[in-house]
């Protein structure tokens, strides 16, 4: 299509712009990978690169994987990447040498930690351990000859296993270290390492436990370090994206965490692009039957407020959809942005599995908003805005009325829906405004602590 050609009717209905971009162009324009990488451990970046294999130039992806992992101890995998890049069946001697060094170091760590590892697998020993780490260490020292150096060897061994890509072993070793160590800095580091390991083994329940442990560590260990808290919260927000969209029970807990004053302030200050994921979570929560109406409406209002505040700092088709629908009340723009949002969702590692749910929920929200501000609705017109034919639109509206229990009736003869909108009481309006003022006050308290 020529650049100056007008859009076809089909283009308008699908929400494409007058100068339409392809799905690939939209995906590339809103690719967040460069923004996400600085906040992720290199091992956590790897799944994102793997996901991009089918979207970007394959040679560039392979080279990126090599650059990402060449400093790890995943020697065999890195050597295979080198062979693929150089189209060779042989590898340089340096890879062979490093492999031997890694195997030797693994053997050394295994021997150093063998005694304490065996003790921690002995039920009679574990039965004598208590919540007091110092007392536990004293007991193990007096009864079994365990030293602080042995405990620290668990930490070093766990880190080494992680660098080798043995994430399950790393998680277990770091857990054992954390049970005994009184070194707060190393314990905090081990908790981050265990979180990454649980993510990379897709152990989502365990990962969520570690998210909460890291959160508590940030609040206590960095209590007098606001800059450190900001940086660590930023990291935690990004790491938490893995369970956020892969583990349904995590959705509520993490949405609540992200909306808490400390974390929404972190998002607005340091990483506004996270609004994409927060918006996607809130929109898709519309489909979840167990969500209470009051809780969902609060999330939606908080999201609208933040999108309005941060529009100058960050926007993409997902946040633009929220803006068009709830701030500008522009239904044509909302439908256009929904089409673009679907392309972005399907190209985003974290959101690809939520794309269908997002589109379904977004259509419901368009319908609900449209019905709220119109007294008489033309079924054909609303169907067009939803990208549906008239029969599909009619069924959609019938289901909408049934599901939301709105006071409305359908005039099949005229092809319209007549809405009965009860007026909102002054008392209710005051409550809504008070809630908004309270939220802003809480955020300001974290921005400007007294």
UniProtKB/Swiss-Prot annotation:
Q: Which family does it belong to?
A: Belongs to the eIF-3 subunit E family.
- PANTHER family named among the record's database cross-references: EUKARYOTIC TRANSLATION INITIATION FACTOR 3 SUBUNIT E
Q: Which residues form the PCI domain?
A: 255-424
* GO molecular function, a single term: translation initiation factor activity
Looking at the UniProt record for this protein, which Gene Ontology cellular component terms does it annotate, in alphabetical order? eukaryotic 43S preinitiation complex; eukaryotic 48S preinitiation complex; eukaryotic translation initiation factor 3 complex, eIF3e
Name of the protein this chain belongs to = Eukaryotic translation initiation factor 3 subunit E
The record's note on quaternary structure and interaction partners says:
Component of the eukaryotic translation initiation factor 3 (eIF-3) complex.
Origin organism is Aspergillus clavatus (strain ATCC 1007 / CBS 513.65 / DSM 816 / NCTC 3887 / NRRL 1 / QM 1276 / 107)
User: What lineage is on file?
Assistant: Eukaryota, Fungi, Dikarya, Ascomycota, Pezizomycotina
Q: What are the subcellular locations of this protein?
A: Cytoplasm
Q: Does the keyword Cytoplasm apply?
A: yes
- The organism's superkingdom is given as Eukaryota
The GO biological-process annotations, alphabetized, read as:
formation of cytoplasmic translation initiation complex
Query: What keywords are annotated for this sequence in UniProt?
Result: Cytoplasm, Initiation factor, Protein biosynthesis
One Pfam family this sequence matches: EIF3E_C
- Function comment: Component of the eukaryotic translation initiation factor 3 (eIF-3) complex, which is involved in protein synthesis of a specialized repertoire of mRNAs and, together with other initiation factors, stimulates binding of mRNA and methionyl-tRNAi to the 40S ribosome. The eIF-3 complex specifically targets and initiates translation of a subset of mRNAs involved in cell proliferation.
Spell out the HAMAP family in the cross-references: eIF3e
């Amino acid at each position: 299509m020529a650049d100056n050609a007008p859009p076809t009717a089909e283009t308008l209905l699908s929400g494409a712009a007058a100068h339409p971009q392809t799905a690939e162009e939209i995906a590339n324009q809103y690719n967040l990978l460069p923004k996400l990488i600085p906040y992720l451990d290199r091992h956590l970046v790897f799944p994102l690169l793997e996901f991009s294999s089918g979207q970007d130039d394959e040679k560039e992806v392979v080279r990126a994987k090599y650059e990402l992992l060449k400093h790890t101890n995943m020697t065999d995998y890195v050597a295979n990447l080198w062979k693929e890049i150089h189209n060779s069946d042989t590898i340089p001697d340096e890879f062979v040498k490093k492999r031997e060094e890694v195997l030797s170091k693994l053997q050394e760590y295994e021997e150093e930690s063998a005694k304490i590892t065996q003790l921690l697998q002995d039920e009679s020993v574990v039965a004598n351990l208590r919540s007091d780490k110092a007392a536990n260490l004293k007991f193990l020292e007096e009864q079994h000859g365990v030293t602080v150096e042995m405990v620290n060897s668990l930490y070093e061994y766990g880190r080494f296993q992680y660098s080798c890509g043995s994430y399950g072993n790393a998680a277990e070793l770091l857990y054992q270290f954390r049970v005994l160590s009184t070194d707060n800095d190393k314990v905090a580091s081990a908790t981050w390492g265990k979180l990454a390991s649980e993510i990379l083994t897709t152990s989502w329940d365990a990962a969520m436990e570690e998210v909460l442990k890291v959160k508590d560590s940030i609040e206590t260990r960095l209590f007098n370090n606001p800059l450190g808290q900001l940086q660590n919260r930023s990291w935690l927000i990004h790491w938490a994206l893995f369970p956020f969209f892969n583990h349904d029970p995590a959705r509520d807990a993490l949405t609540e965490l992200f909306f808490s004053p400390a974390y929404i302030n972190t998002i607005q200050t340091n990483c506004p692009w996270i609004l994409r994921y927060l918006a996607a979570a809130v929109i898709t929560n519309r489909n979840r039957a167990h969500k209470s109406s009051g809780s969902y409406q609060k999330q939606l209002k908080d999201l609208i407020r933040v999108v309005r505040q941060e529009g100058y700092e960050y926007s993409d088709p997902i946040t633009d959809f929220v803006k068009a629908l709830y701030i500008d009340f522009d239904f044509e723009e909302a439908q256009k942005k929904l089409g673009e949002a679907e392309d972005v969702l399907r190209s985003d590692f974290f959101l690809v599995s939520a794309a269908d749910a997002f589109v379904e929920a977004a259509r419901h929200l368009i319908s609900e908003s449209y019905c709220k501000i119109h007294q008489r609705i033309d079924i054909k017109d609303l169907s067009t805005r939803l990208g549906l034919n008239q029969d599909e639109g009619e069924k959609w509206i019938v289901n909408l009325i049934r599901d939301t229990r709105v006071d409305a009736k359908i005039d099949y003869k005229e092809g319209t829906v007549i809405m009965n909108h009860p007026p909102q009481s002054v008392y209710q309006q005051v409550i809504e405004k008070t809630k908004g003022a309270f939220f802003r006050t809480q955020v300001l308290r974290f921005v400007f602590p007294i």
